[in-house]
A protein has these predicted regions:
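Hydrophobic beta-strand scaffold residues
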Residues: 29, 45, 82-83, 106
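N-terminal Rossmann-like NAD(P) cofactor-binding module of classical short-chain dehydrogenase/reductase
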Residues: 59-60
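Extreme N-terminal starter segment of soluble prokaryotic enzymes
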Residues: 1-4
Length: 253
């Protein structure tokens, strides 16, 4: 069984992970970290991770950027692997994460969904077939009207997976409104839609002469990210120092 400290346990994602772990005999949350203590959990909750005195195999972090430094310090000091799901880190924090790779196991991915990460692997293979055959590649991502960034980090990660497979020969185009020229064969177009309560939808098109191949992933709730984090925690238990991602989790299955 994998014993977990859930940092950000009383947030939406923390509570979703709590419920998933209750139904899984192979993993258990043994302690939580959260400033807000208004939820009755079946594990002890501490206001900060440095106050936690419970032994664990892995830390799952779904909190906020301000808390990440303390989490990293704790995990390095205690030699506890960490699944780092918090986004919006500063350049200084990202540099600190890079340093932590040398000292403890850290799993960090642009998207925790098993589906998205499987899609990335499929796109690498598809690009190697379709790109040399002259197919154009476009990505369309859709999210709710409260999302601040565009394009999404996941859309960029999908584009990167294609580009990596093609020796980084492609550049990204986000806006064609100011251009009056033919499409560059070496571009990947990325378009963003914002509306309603769309959790997350990503579509990748390979457009050739007389045929179009589409890959699509739709997230109907944020539970897909929570499930991925749980699988990542199981995978990370006992791992040595280094940078891991969801591709490693999928490869191990």
């Amino acid at each position: 069984m994998t014993k977990v400290i859930m940092n950000g346990c009383n947030g939406k994602m923390g509570q979703t992970i709590t419920e998933i772990c209750k139904a899984d005999a192979d993993i258990k949350i043994v302690a939580g970290i959260d400033l807000y203590d208004g939820i009755d959990n079946d594990y002890p909750v501490f206001s900060s991770i440095d106050k936690c005195d419970v032994d664990a195999d892995v830390v799952i972090d779904f909190s906020n950027a301000k808390a990440v430094d303390g989490v990293l310090d704790y995990c390095v000091d205690k030699q506890v692997p960490v699944v780092l799901c918090t986004t919006g880190l500063s350049d200084e924090q990202l540099a600190k994460v890079e340093e932590c790779y040398k000292k403890v196991a850290v799993l960090k991915s642009a998207n925790m969904s098993l589906g998205i990460n499987t899609l990335m692997a499929l796109l690498k293979k598809a690009a190697q077939v379709f790109a040399p055959a002259g197919f154009d590649m476009e990505i369309v991502e859709k999210h709710h009207n409260l999302k601040l960034d565009a394009p999404s980090g996941t859309a960029l990660a999908l584009a990167d997976s294609i580009n990596d497979a093609m020796d980084n020969e492609y550049h990204y185009v986000y806006d064609r409104s100011q251009r009056r020229e033919k499409r560059d064969p070496k571009e990947i177009g990325i378009s963003a839609v914002r509306g309603g309560s769309i959790v997350g939808e990503h579509e990748v098109l390979f457009c050739g002469q007389d045929e179009v191949i589409e890959f699509k992933h739709t997230a109907y709730s944020k539970a897909v990210f929570a499930k991925g984090a749980v699988e990542a925690a199981k995978f990370l238990k006992g791992k040595g120092a280094g940078h891991y991602d969801m591709a490693d989790v999928i490869a191990a299955k």
